[in-house]
Amino acid sequence: MYIERQLEKKFIAINEEYACVLLTGPRQVGKSTMLRHLMEGTARAEVSLDDLEERRLAKTDPAMFLKLHPAPVLIDEVQYAPELFSYIKIAVDNGAAPGSYWLTGSQAYRLMELAQESLAGRTAILHMSALSQSELCGVVDVSPFSLELDELQKRKAVLSPATPNEIYQRIWGGALPGHRSGKYKDRDVFYSSYIQTYIDRDVTTDIPGVDKVMFADFIRAAACRSGQMLNLHDIAGDVGVSDDTAKRWMKELEKSGIVFFLHPYSNNLLKRTIKTPKMYFFDTGLVCYLTRYSSPEILMNGAINGAILENYVVSEIIKTYSNSAQDCLLHYYRDKNSNEIDLIMESDGQLHPIEIKKSINPPTQITGAFKLLDKASVPRGTGAIICLREALSAIDSGTYIVPAWMI
């Protein structure tokens, strides 16, 4: 079953303007599936550089490769043959029509570097995340998450309400289309294959000679700390590698789109803030698999129930922006007095503080730290508690209580 993606309309619009469109995103988020859906009934051909013979030709004779695969064409996993970029540039400079080249790849940082070096101003770059909860609800016409009351009311009208148990079912089930579409029903087999493929194809290419078993242990150790401030020394100790190795491996996870970091908010007027970033996984289903939670019910009562909810909320907010091809400025706040704000959204010249709580009736005093942002040079805007309550409500005119299903 194909799940409609919010990014489809943006991709189609961009495709009418640019000869080359690059779609990045982690493995298995549905990049190729969406593009195959969009090219149904057209003359566009597809070639994947996962095919070793095609990859060899693309690397050794890119001109011949492009002759054998003329535009319009979809080139999948283009990061395996960076030699193609300069030849695509020539084709674009020679007047290639809009939509001639669709490129996909699972190493966003490297691909963006290559595109900026060889195709600056000639290619549009879009990023695809795993499925958002709105996409899983069949809703693709929705704006990025905002704490404007009108926008919250719009989300309330189109999204599907969820009980606390249903929220944890969403968290446990994850957001990768291969499993959520029903194509691969056995969740454990799916995620086991996902990790194995990622290590075999990407990690061994980027880190020659890597110990595959130790790297798998490293991912698991990181998953146990998702939603926490990054402590590479502790992770390294759990796995039995050096701090330098742990740092290099964590960069690999970030580069591959497995994890992301939330950096602390600070400015010259907030001098006592902690500098350590917090680490999150883009897919909570992967975290639950790696930490061996066998059901949503056990997860909901488990040791990571609060951290995994926070991970879910932060990643879902990011998806609402990436699905609209918009940037999202997110931070967290923690100072040396242990005052903390889970999330700060910076938008329209304001700071919007957010607390994320595994509670139906969160205590209102947890918003007390919000006032610390009044010292910042950027004005404080509307704040919120995002929690398991099923209905939208408010503490006062400046602080909403937002259900997690409404993201």
Regions found by a protein language model. Name each.
Residues 53-55, 80-82, 110-111:
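Catalytic P-loop NTPase motifs of RecA-like helicase/translocase cores
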Residues 44-72:
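Short glycine-rich substrate-engagement loop in P-loop NTPases that contacts/grips substrate
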Residues 109-125, 139-142:
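Short regulatory helix/loop adjacent to the ATP-binding pocket of P-loop NTPases
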Residues 124-135:
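Conserved AAA+ ATPase "SRH/arginine-finger" region at the nucleotide-binding site
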Residues 1-9, 13-28, 32-45, 49, ...:
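A cross-kingdom feature that marks ATP-driven nucleic-acid transaction machinery
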Residues 85-103, 107-109, 116-117:
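Conserved catalytic/switch belt of AAA+ P-loop NTPases
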